[in-house]
Structure formats: structure tokens, C-alpha cells
UniProtKB/Swiss-Prot annotation:
Naturally occurring in which organism (per UniProt): Saccharomyces cerevisiae (strain ATCC 204508 / S288c)
GO molecular function: ATP binding; ATP hydrolysis activity; metal ion binding; P-type calcium transporter activity
GO cellular component labels: fungal-type vacuole membrane; intracellular membrane-bounded organelle; plasma membrane
Catalyzed reactions per annotation: Ca(2+)(in) + ATP + H2O = Ca(2+)(out) + ADP + phosphate + H(+)
Binding site for Mg(2+): 445, 447, 841
Stretches of the chain found on the membrane's Cytoplasmic side: 1-114, 174-349, 410-899, 951-976, 1030-1065, 1121-1173
List of residues binding ATP: 447, 643, 762-764, 816, 822, 844
Record-annotated active site: 445
Topology Vacuolar: residue spans: 140-152, 369-388, 923-929, 999-1010, 1087-1099
Binding site for Ca(2+) 1: 398, 403, 937, 941
Protein name: Calcium-transporting ATPase 2
Entry EC no(s): 7.2.2.10
Length: 1173
């Protein structure tokens, strides 16, 4: 079919076959004539051709069929009850079905599928069956004293099965908790707000509540919440995350697309096999304008409105997400510890295999020869002996495999992220929580992070007048210089009108419909400002923390907040400050803002807005071109309004307007006066804004030929418009105050004590930036005297790489910086070896946020693009939250190191003790039975992980220097403690096991009864557990004397007091109580299942006192400097030890290099300690 034939067919289809059904067929409810699939076809793929099939060449048909209005949006009687409407019943809302988590039983089954657990279960069942056979089918046996021996072997089988069940249950419970934690995190990070027009009002709603037919307002930095068709404006979108297309795509209104489609596919055009569609290129190289905004794409520049056509699972983003099965991510630390656990497991498996081979070989020698010890036993007893060997070997594997390592990091991260959320950090990427512990540099924005982001115009120079609303002046001066008084008495009505037009029309902020003015605060802009921070926090937290479908709770909370107070305007804080000034002093009435924008003719004599130029950080200004009905010569003319950074806008001004409307050409004298005013504002830490305009009286249409944009001929090129010679008139200067956040100075000083360098990166001019940096201690007296302590972004980006590296140690303030300057700063710092955290709020900050080791975006003032690019969202935009993130990052690292220290002590001791005692035993039994070992395994894996991985940050955690990138899991001081405690425990348990008969019964080993032997074995087990009990107490504090080489200097309460701040971690205290109580119960009531014989008083005292030796050993090890250990174990010895016993010879890669990324021993920061590693 030719193009004209198909074009005619499209027209015929549209005229004759438009959707006309009204019933419930195809899932369409009454009053809606389009199905979900029909609307979904518009975007998947993007097709204006499909649009024409449905709606024809008139965009108004789109609004007709979706029952919405281009300007007023959809009409809902009660916005909160949208689920009762046919619109919702027909198309749904924009929420996606939640991923169904694994049930608890599924997790139990997954935990039981562990091969070791299954082997142990099979062995337990066999042991149980053999025990029953001996009990019921074999004659009774008697000991040398003639006492009947109780047949209790079957009890051990049952006890092992119960122990396996408990281990599996605990493992499943931990996994279930982890599933819930990640589900909760995903809910928090996937929710956000969008501006929609409903009932002819702009409101903020959750993206999950967006409906088909909603008209949404999009601006730079937004992420498109659902598939929509653009109906007004112009913007650039990044669709790479959805389509993979790396180039940005310009978006135009649907009318442009329909015009191009009709033109390119007209009968007069060249023939093609099929009509051209969005993305196709005609013979002239032109494309059809793209009006289709895909859900999940990002608005990089511009602004506009779109009407929603597909939501939820019917949108492109929804279809993509439902096809994925997102599993919780593994962080680098989790992967590292999993590999470490695998390496340790190798040693356990090797030990178990050797143990089995030794015991089995001896077992064969016992049963094959006629004089062998087991030769005369019946088959069931021989089988039972073999099963004991097998169970002991399998249990060694169970104990040796440190499954608690991955669990510990999961618990530590879950605990830390939960607490960080309470402290104002929403962790989007788990690895960032770990990385913050090593941070050495923080590059922070100023606005909202170091300051409150509660902006108020406190000083200004309208024309040649001056006002001052700050409270620093005497009362009499305040009355004279009050802004309202100055505007009314000193400024002409036309100047006031032009300033009001510039502020009202040249803004994206809008009026808060829920705002209720407090009569008691009619002139209290300061009172208004005080509460902004609290409301922003409430909004931000609700935005990210809605649970399930508790919209009613959210609405109720907002209603309660509204009873107190809210800000009158929503949007950019600079723009809301200017609008507040307009309401306070320029006559803007409540509820009038949107009316003036819709009907500018009424007050301003403006026919229409012809070009909008939204603010971008790279330009530092926003602009607007309007058409006036008539000017002084009674003819229509165009006016360009501009407001932005004072020094940038004012330097392009040719004239200065006086308060009486006379113009004064700018020369060197009055230019210096203006520059001085700007400097004075900046020196007082005020943001200086210039407000200006330029008239175009000689052009009949917009834009003038000389200003026309080559790519978009219907608008003026921004560089030509702003830099056009002559004519820009400066209407006034305004100084905006943004108070420093409470406690920010202390937070910065905390970072400095912690060895973290804080740099301020801001778009403000250098004088303002330096003033604020001094106030918050970033720029101290010592640093400010140094060269290059503060510089502007334009100067910084001109430097060579080597010059940047040379000045960065002194640089603390980067002013008038662009997002590219911030990215360059981060790149240079990382190249110098720093671990860099950076904050960002704008769309253009995304590259820097991605490049940084940890990117912080603003939860209140940040764009959606910035949030998507970040690792952590600062829900309150507060710098103190970054300090908390550093604390918790360090706490995670410390908690993991504590657990590794404890785990390896128990691991080494338990495996060696079991191995040696089994081999040395004449009847091939270990001093620790399988059930006892499973109890020990429960202590060292699950309970210890809960106790040690859930600790809060130490009070002095910010007094230590950061480790940087080369932080190792196991330091010299940790290895000292591991080897010393393991040696102590082995000596104590070996003495009790091998010399117990002589110590307690004054008899040789061969002379004691089986009951006495069982008592000694039980005492060894009891001692072993109490050793771990007190070792856990030692492990809760890492070596605080690290780095102190003086023996006397290491004797301090901070280093040696293991009970310091013990009460702050209730988890630890509870678990210690559980371990101690359970051990006492086992020793009194464990009986046959735990192979326990009643202990004497002396045995109890011995066990507990021997356990306390761990505390004494801990003190001695802490006093010993690390340098002593390094000298004992030289580097060459350690490298050979790692190569052989670390199994590095098995892990060589093909190039011959060692793949030691996950090796147990890592290279340390200090040259002295490398020998020990």
C-alpha cells in the first residue's frame, strides 16, 4: 500500500471506526471508550500513527476520550477517594504489583537444602535407627562395675535432628527478616511526588496515585511517572534507562507531531511503502516531532505538560519492571565475606576429611583383625561406631563453615540502614553504607545542606531606593526601611508592576492551596520561615516512607500539620522567597497567583507568554518573553524578563532604572556602585539576585530574525537573547537570606576531627560562599590564609590535572561552580586516592553523584534525576545526616570486624579441639559431641551475629582517622587477639581434657569410671562455652590503642575496659543472658541428649574461672603494641604461610598472579604492619 493510500485509510478508520462501545467489554467500563491495550500501543513503540488511528488529527479528541481538560485536568469530587471512580476501575492507578516475597516455609526449605544439613540429617536418622535397634533388639550390656548400661544412642540421633531443625529455623527466620527489610527499603526508595492539575488546581501527589487522563506538570529534573502525551511546552528527555538510546530526545507538543505527520505523509510527498512515524527520517533529513513521553525517562531541560495515557503495569516502565524479578542486591562487603567464608570452609572440609580418614582407618584396624577392639561387636554396634565417626566429621564441617559471616553483614547493614533512616538518610544502594565508613572527603552543597533552605528577601535595591527587612537594625530604622513602606512610598507604580510581573510570571513555583494564613503573623515572614523546615521534613519523610496503602494516614497527618502552618508557595526556595516578597510588599493577593498567570492581561496588560526559559544552574538565570498589548507608542511590543545571579545579570545590563522610572546609562561610576552593593550583600552571606528586562519594540512577531534559534526557529536562541547588545535594563537588586542550619558548625568540626575534609561547592558568588564557609568552620583562619583556599569554578576548570592535584589539599570553597566543575573536583579527588562523598540536588549533578564513591541527593529540594543517580537520599537536606552516615558506615565496618574476630577464635579452637580429641581418643569419640558442637555453632553464628553486628557507634568513633580505600577486614591487632585467645582456649581445654582425671579424681585416665569420664567431658564442654562467653565480651570492643607503640600509652580505660558502654546495646545484653542461661540449663538438665553428667561444685568454679581467663588475655594482648607482633612474624614468613596454608597456590590465575582480592589476609595501610599481613 502506498503512503497516500494508507494515509487515506487512517483517516477513514478514524472517521468511521472510532471506539464507540460503552459497556464492560474488553475491560472498558461505562463512559470510557478506550481499552488499556489501545492506549498502551501509543508508546510501545512510540507511534503518532497509532494516535491518529484513535483520535484523528485533532488533539482535542484525546481529551474528549479521556474525559479530561487540557488546562483544568480531570475533575474528582474527592481526590483522596479516586479508587471509587470508573476511571480507576477501568485503567487502575500507577502502582505496580509488589514482588511476592518467599514465604517462611519456602525459606525453611531453602535453608534445609544446604548439603551439610542434609548429610547431618541423614546421619542423625541412621544413628537414631541404629540406636533403636540396639535398644529393642540387642541384649543389655553392663559396665565393669556390673551396672546396666543405658542404651541412649537413639537420643543422640533425636538431639541432632532437633538441633538441625533449630539451626534451619533460625536461618530461615533471619532470611525472612532480610526479605522484609529489603521489601521495606524498596517501598521507601520507589515512592516520590509529582505535580498534577486536578479540578483546575496544581497539587502534589504520589506518583502511585496518578490516573489515566491526569495532566501532569514536568520540569527539569523530573522523572516521568507514567506514559503520557506532551500537550504544551518543550523539553529534552533521556530515555536511555528504558530504551537504551544514549542520545537525548527533544519533546514537542502533540499538535506539532500531528502537523509533521500530516505533512510528511501527505499525498504530495514522495511515495513510501508505509507512512513515516516518530523516529523515521524523510528525504530531507527531517523527523516527525516526538510528543510521546515514556515512563521512567528523565527530563534533562525545559518544562511542559502532558496527559497520562497508560499507568501501572500497562505503561512501558511497568511492563519492563514486571518482567524482572529483582532480588536483593549483594554488597561488596557481603560478597567479600561470602568468599572469606568459602575460604574458611575449605579448611573445615579438609580437616573433616582428614579426621574421617584417620578415624576410619583406625576403625578398620579395630574391626578387621581378630584381636581388634571392635571385632567382637555385633553389626549394629559396629554400625553405630561408624556413624559416630561420620557424624563427628560432618559436624566439624558444620562448625567450620562460618555461615554467620554473610548473616552478620546483613544484620549490620539492616540495623544501620534502619537507624540511618531515623537520622534522616534513606539508603538506596547498600554498598554506600559500607563505603561511608572509609570516606575521607565530603563535597557539600550550600543551600539546604549547610543552610536551612528557608529563604527570605531581607534587603533590596529597587531602582535607586533601598529597603532592609532584617532584624539587625534599630527599631526606628526598621520602620523607615520596611520593604512595603519603601515600595509604596519611593517606587513608581510601573516599577512595582514590572517587578511583580517578573516575579509572578517568570517562576515555576505555585501557590499552596492548603496554606492557611495565621492572622497573628500577618507581618511575620520570620515566623513563617521558622516552620518551613519542619513541614519539609514531614513531606519528605511521608514521600519516602508510606507503608502499604495508608494514604488516609498520610492525608490525616498533612491535615494535622496544616492546622499549625505551611509555606504559602511550593517550588524553588529562591522563587518562593520572591513570591513571599510580592505578597508582603507588592500587592500579590492570596489565591491570585495562578489567575495572574492565566489572565496576565488583567493586571499587566500582557497578551500572552511567547517564550519561557527555565532556570538552569549552568546559566544561573531564568527568563520569560511576553507580548504586551500596547506600549507608549500605542503599539504591541515584546519584553524579555530576566532574574538570576546578580553579577551575571547586572554585567550585561546597559541601563539602570531609577525608582521614578527614569533610566540611567551604566558607566564606570554607577557600575562600581552596583558592584559594591552586590559585594556587600554577598559579604553578609546573602544571595544576590538581579531583576531586569529588555523591550523589543520594532519586531512584529517573535522571535526577531537576528535572534532566531537555528534548531527551533519559533524561539529565540538563549545566548543571543541574553548577550544581545544594548537594551537590558536593571530594575533592582534583592538580597535573600538563608540562615545557617543549627549544629552545622559542630558537624563540620566533627568531620574535621574524624579526618574527613569538608569542601563547599556552591553556585553562589565567592564572597557569599566564603562568608558562609567561615560561619560553618569549613574555612578556618589557618586555611583561609593559604593560597587557593577558595576559588571560582571558571578558574578551577582551566587548571591542568597536576595543578588541580597541587591546590586541592588547601581548597575548601569552590564558588560559582557548575555541575561539571563538581564532577571534575570529584574525579580529581578520587584520582588522589580519596574516598569521596558528594551532595547534589540538580539534574546536572547526576554525573558527579554517579562518579562519587557515595552520592547524596536532597530529599526536599533535589530533582528526581539527582535522586535516581544518588546512593543515599538526605530526607531533611541536613549536613548532620552526612555525619551520621559516616558514623554508621564506620560502625558497620567495626561491627563486622568484631564478629570476624570472635568467629575465627571459636572456629579455630572448636575444629582443632574436636580433631585432636577424636584422634587421641581410644574409642574415636570427640570431647565435644555433635549436639554440643551444634549448640556452639548456634552461639558463634547466629547469636553472636545478632549481638556484635547490632551495636551502635562508639561515642569516640568520630575521633579516629578514616582508613581510606585500603581498609582491611583483619588488622594486626585483630590477628593478635585471634591467635592469642585461640592459643589460650586450646591450652585450657587440652589440660582439662587430658589431665582432668588427675586434677579432679587423683586417678590415671584408665582408672576412672565412664561416669567420671562423662563428667570431665561435660566440664570441658562447659569451660569451652564460658570461654566463648567472655571472649564475646572482649570482642565487643576493638583495639582502641591501635597505632600507639608505647606500652604505657596503651594502658587506658578506653582500651582495656571491656564493660564500657555495655548498657547501650540491649541486643548484646539479651543475647549474653540467653547464652548464659541456656548453658546453665543444658548443664543441669541436658542429660543424655547433650551427653551431660552432673557437675561438682569445683567443676563449675573451674569452668567459669577458666572462661574469665579470656578477659585477662584480652587485657594483655591490648597492652602489647602491634609492632611487637610484626617483629615476631616477619613478612617473608607471613607470605609463605599465606601461600601454603592460605591455599593461594590453588587460586593462581592464568597470568601467574595471585587472585588475592578475597584473601583472608590483606595489605595494611601502615608499612610496619605489612609484615603481619
Amino acid at each position: 500500500m502506498s503512503r497516500q493510500d494508507e494515509n487515506s485509510a487512517l483517516l477513514a478508520n478514524n472517521e468511521n471506526n472510532k471506539p464507540s462501545y460503552t459497556g464492560n467489554e474488553n475491560g472498558v467500563y461505562d463512559n470510557f471508550k478506550l481499552s488499556k491495550s489501545q492506549l498502551s500501543d501509543l508508546h510501545n513503540p512510540k507511534s503518532i500513527r497509532s494516535f491518529v488511528r484513535l483520535f484523528g488529527y485533532e488533539s482535542n479528541s484525546l481529551f474528549k476520550y479521556l474525559k479530561t481538560d487540557k488546562n483544568a485536568g480531570i475533575s474528582l469530587p474527592e481526590i483522596s477517594n479516586y479508587r471509587k471512580t470508573n476511571r480507576y476501575k477501568n485503567y487502575g492507578d500507577n502502582s505496580l504489583p509488589e514482588r511476592i516475597p518467599k514465604s517462611f516455609l519456602q525459606l525453611v526449605w531453602a535453608a534445609f537444602n544446604d548439603k551439610t544439613m542434609q548429610l547431618l540429617t541423614v546421619a542423625a536418622v541412621v544413628s537414631f535407627v541404629l540406636g533403636l535397634y540396639e535398644l529393642w533388639m540387642q541384649p543389655p550390656q553392663y559396665d565393669p562395675e556390673g551396672n546396666k548400661i543405658k542404651q541412649v544412642d537413639w537420643i543422640e540421633g533425636v538431639a541432632i535432628m532437633i538441633a538441625v531443625f533449630v539451626v534451619v529455623l533460625v536461618s530461615a527466620a533471619n532470611d525472612y527478616q532480610k526479605e522484609l527489610q529489603f521489601a521495606k527499603l524498596n517501598k521507601k526508595k520507589e515512592n516520590r511526588k509529582i505535580i498534577v492539575i486536578r479540578n483546575d488546581q496544581e497539587i502534589l501527589i504520589s506518583i502511585h496515585h496518578v490516573l489515566v487522563g491526569d495532566v501532569i506538570s514536568l520540569q527539569t529534573g523530573d522523572v516521568v511517572p507514567a506514559d503520557c502525551v506532551m500537550i504544551s511546552g518543550k523539553c529534552e528527555a533521556d530515555e536511555s534507562s528504558i530504551t537504551g538510546e544514549s542520545n537525548t530526545i527533544q519533546k514537542f507538543p502533540v499538535d506539532n507531531s500531528l502537523r509533521d505527520f500530516k505533512k510528511f505523509n501527505s499525498i504530495d510527498s514522495h511515495n513510501h511503502s508505509k507512512p513515516l512515524d516518530i523516529g523515521d527520517v524523510n528525504e530531507d533529513g527531517n523527523k516527525i516531532a516526538d510528543c510521546m513521553l515514556i515512563s521512567g525517562s528523565r527530563i534533562l531541560s525545559g518544562l511542559g505538560r502532558g496527559v497520562i495515557t497508560s499507568v501501572g503495569i500497562n505503561s512501558v516502565y511497568g511492563q519492563t519492571m514486571t518482567s524482572l524479578n529483582a532480588e536483593p542486591e549483594s554488597t561488596p562487603l557481603q560478597l567479600h565475606l561470602s568468599q572469606l567464608a568459602d575460604n574458611i570452609s575449605v579448611y573445615g572440609c579438609v580437616s573433616a576429611i582428614i579426621l574421617f580418614l584417620v578415624l576410619f582407618t583406625r576403625y578398620l584396624f579395630y574391626i578387621i583383625p581378630e584381636d581388634g577392639r571392635f571385632h567382637d561387636l555385633d553389626p549394629a554396634q559396629k554400625g553405630s561406631k561408624f556413624m559416630n565417626i561420620f557424624i563427628t566429621s560432618i559436624t566439624v564441617i558444620v562448625v567450620a563453615v562460618p555461615e554467620g559471616l554473610p548473616l552478620a553483614v546483613t544484620l549490620a547493614l539492616a540495623f544501620a540502614t534502619t537507624r540511618m533512616t531515623k537520622d534522616g538518610n534513606l539508603v538506596r544502594v547498600l554498598r554506600s553504607c559500607e563505603t561511608m565508613g572509609s570516606a575521607t572527603a565530603v563535597c557539600s552543597d550550600k543551600t539546604g545542606t549547610l543552610t536551612e533552605n528557608v529563604m527570605t528577601v531581607v534587603r533590596g535595591f529597587p531602582g535607586n531606593s533601598k529597603f532592609d527587612d532584617s532584624k539587625s537594625l534599630p527599631v526606628s530604622e526598621q520602620r523607615k526601611l520596611n520593604s512595603k513602606k519603601v515600595f509604596e512610598e519611593n517606587c513608581s507604580s510601573s516599577l512595582r508592576n514590572d517587578l511583580l510581573a517578573n516575579i509572578v510570571l517568570n517562576s515555576t513555583a505555585f501557590e499552596n492551596r492548603d496554606y492557611k494564613k495565621n492572622d497573628k503573623n500577618t507581618n511575620g515572614s520570620k515566623n513563617m520561615s521558622k516552620n518551613l523546615s519542619f513541614l519539609d521534613k514531614c513531606k519528605s519523610r511521608l514521600s519516602f516512607f508510606k507503608k502499604g496503602n495508608r494514604e488516609d494516614d498520610e492525608d490525616q497527618l498533612f491535615k494535622n500539620v496544616n492546622k499549625g502552618r505551611q509555606e504559602p508557595f511550593i517550588g524553588s526556595k529562591t522563587e518562593t522567597a520572591l513570591l513571599s516578597l510580592a505578597r508582603l510588599s507588592l500587592g500579590l493577593q492570596p489565591g491570585e497567583l495562578q489567575y495572574l498567570r492565566d489572565q496576565p492581561m488583567e493586571k499587566f496588560n500582557i497578551e500572552k507568554v511567547v517564550q519561557t526559559i527555565p532556570f538552569e544552574s549552568s546559566r544561573k538565570w531564568a527568563g520569560l518573553v511576553v507580548k504586551y498589548k500596547e506600549g507608549k507608542n500605542k503599539k504591541p511590543f515584546y519584553r524579555f524578563f530576566i532574574k538570576g545571579a546578580a553579577e551575571i545579570v547586572s554585567k550585561n545590563c546597559s541601563y539602570k532604572r531609577n525608582s521614578d522610572d527614569t533610566l540611567e546609562e551604566i558607566n564606570e561610576d554607577n557600575k562600581k556602585e552596583t558592584d559594591d552593593e552586590i559585594k556587600n550583600l554577598a559579604s553578609d552571606a546573602l544571595r544576590a539576585i538581579s531583576v531586569a528586562h529588555k523591550d523589543f519594540c520594532e519586531c512584529d512577531s517573535w522571535p526577531p530574525e537576528q535572534l532566531r534559534d537555528k534548531d527551533s526557529p519559533n524561539i529565540a536562541a538563549l545566548d543571543l537573547l541574553f548577550n544581545s547588545q544594548k537594551g537590558l535594563i536593571l530594575d533592582g537588586l534583592l538580597g535573600i537570606q538563608d540562615p545557617l542550619r543549627a549544629g552545622v558548625r559542630e558537624s563540620v568540626q566533627q568531620c574535621q576531627r574524624a579526618g574527613v575534609t569538608v569542601r563547599m561547592v556552591t553556585g553562589d558568588n565567592i564572597l557569599t560562599a566564603k562568608a558562609i564557609a567561615r560561619n560553618c568552620a569549613i574555612l578556618s583562619t589557618d586555611i583561609s590564609s593559604e593560597a587557593y583556599s577558595a576559588m571560582e569554578g571558571t578558574e578551577f576548570r582551566k587548571l591542568t590535572k597536576n595543578e588541580r592535584i597541587r591546590i586541592l589539599p588547601n581548597l575548601r570553597v569552590l564558588a560559582r561552580s557548575s555541575p561539571e566543575d563538581k564532577r571534575l573536583l570529584v574525579e580529581t579527588l578520587k584520582g588522589m586516592g580519596d574516598v569521596v562523598a558528594v551532595t547534589g540536588d540538580g539534574t546536572n549533578d547526576a554525573p558527579a553523584l554517579k562518579l562519587a564513591d557515595v552520592g547524596f541527593s536532597m530529599g526536599i529540594s533535589g530533582t528526581e534525576v539527582a535522586r535516581e543517580a544518588s546512593d543515599i537520599i538526605l530526607m531533611t537536606d541536613d549536613f548532620s545526616a552526612i555525619v551520621n552516615a559516616i558514623k554508621w558506615g564506620r560502625c558497620v565496618s567495626v561491627s563486622i570486624k568484631k564478629f570476624i574476630q570472635f568467629q575465627l577464635i571459636v572456629n579455630i579452637t572448636a575444629v582443632i579441639l574436636t580433631f585432636v580429641s577424636s584422634v587421641a581418643s581410644s574409642d574415636e569419640t570427640s570431647v565435644l559431641t555433635a549436639v554440643q558442637l551444634l549448640w556452639i555453632n548456634l552461639i558463634m553464628d547466629t547469636l553472636a551475629a545478632l549481638a556484635l553486628a547490632t551495636d551502635k557507634p562508639d561515642p569516640n568513633i568520630m575521633d579516629r582517622k578514616p582508613r581510606g580505600r585500603s581498609t582491611s577486614l583483619i588488622s594486626v591487632s585483630t590477628w593478635k587477639m585471634i591467635l592469642s585467645q585461640a592459643t589460650l582456649q586450646l591450652i585450657v581445654t587440652f589440660i582439662l581434657h587430658f589431665y582432668g582425671p588427675e586434677l579432679f579424681f587423683k586417678k590415671h585416665e584408665d582408672e576412672i569410671t565412664s561416669h567420671q569420664q562423662q563428667q570431665l567431658n561435660a566440664m570441658t564442654f562447659n569451660t569451652f562455652v564460658w570461654l566463648q562467653f567472655f571472649t564475646m565480651l572482649v570482642s565487643r570492643k576493638l583495639d582502641e590503642g591501635d597505632g600507639i607503640s608505647n606500652w604505657r600509652g596503651r594502658i587506658s580505660a578506653a582500651n582495656l575496659n571491656f564493660f564500657q558502654d555495655l548498657g547501650r546495646n540491649y541486643y548484646f545484653l539479651t543475647i549474653m543472658a540467653i547464652i548464659g542461661s541456656c548453658q546453665v540449663l543444658i548443664m543441669f538438665f541436658g542429660g543424655a541428649p547433650f551427653s551431660i553428667a552432673r557437675q561438682t561444685k569445683s567443676m563449675w568454679i573451674t569452668a567459669v574461672l577458666c572462661g574469665m581467663l579470656s578477659l585477662i588475655m584480652g587485657v594483655l594482648v591490648r597492652i602489647c603494641p602491634d609492632e611487637v607482633a610484626v617483629k615476631v612474624f616477619p613478612a617473608a614468613f607471613v607470605q609463605r604461610f599465606k601461600y601454603v596454608f592460605g591455599l593461594e597456590f590453588l587460586r593462581k590465575n592464568h597470568t601467574g598472579k595471585h587472585d588475592d582480592e578475597e584473601a583472608l589476609l590483606e595489605e595494611s595501610d601502615s608499612p610496619e604492619s605489612t609484615a603481619f599481613y
